[in-house]
Amino acid sequence: NVVHYTFELSEVNIGRRYDSCISGVPLKDLTSKSDMVQDALKEFDGGKLIIKEFPTKSANINKIKFHIDRLVSSDFEPGLIIIDYADLMISTKAMEQKTWELEAIYEELRGFGMEIKIPIWSASQTNRLGLDGDIIGLDKIADAYAKAQVADFIATFSRNMVEKEKNKGKFYIAKNRIGVDGKVFGVDFNPAAASIVLQEFDEQVKLEGDIQSLYKKYKDNKEGWG
């Protein structure tokens, strides 16, 4: 079971993206091919999904806790919480600087996840340096230090102009407390169906040369690679 909190898009828009991703029907065709979507959703053997919308910069960890408690009391046991996204929350503490507030928000989310033993995932944006980057490292995540120190796992997704034309991209493991990091994987990206899929091993091997050259180029031009 998944709980998806959205602080930017509406519940309807988020729901449409899930419908498209699960069914494979492009977003623009969801209405005209509603029967196909319904059939795909009926066959879907995953858990249940709750989408909850809060206005931007109106929710803190206490609101999330309260809502989760209500779901649990209604016999809905979440196995994953998605925060879309943490930068648009507010902290329970008054902070003078944005960086401090972001660090507090991520610490509160991580603490709550440890308390209820449920993974919490969020997304973030790059800073200006990351807009033209082939591989997005921790230094290119907006207000990276405050977030990176708290997060257990960080992965980045990026595309150059050639990859955009081919609906491809790169998935880079920037931090991993319980496993290997510094790895780059090719992905198939279908924006029409809100889908990002890691490539199969044989497809990955075909792209290994290009990806490794990008990896080496990035590594050779960065200090403190890790």
Model-derived features with residue positions:
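C-terminal regions of RecA-like/P-loop NTPase motor modules
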Residues: F44, N62-P78, M114-I116, R128-G226
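Cytosolic-facing regulatory segments adjacent to core modules
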Residues: N1-E77, S91, F185-G186
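Structural recognition of the conserved hydrophobic beta-strand(s) that form the central parallel beta-sheet
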Residues: H4, I82-I83, I118-Q125
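Cofactor-binding loop segments of dinucleotide-utilizing enzymes, especially the Rossmann-like FAD-
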Residues: F7, Q125, R159
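Hydrophobic, well-ordered secondary-structure elements that form the walls
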Residues: D84, L109, W121, A151-D152, ...
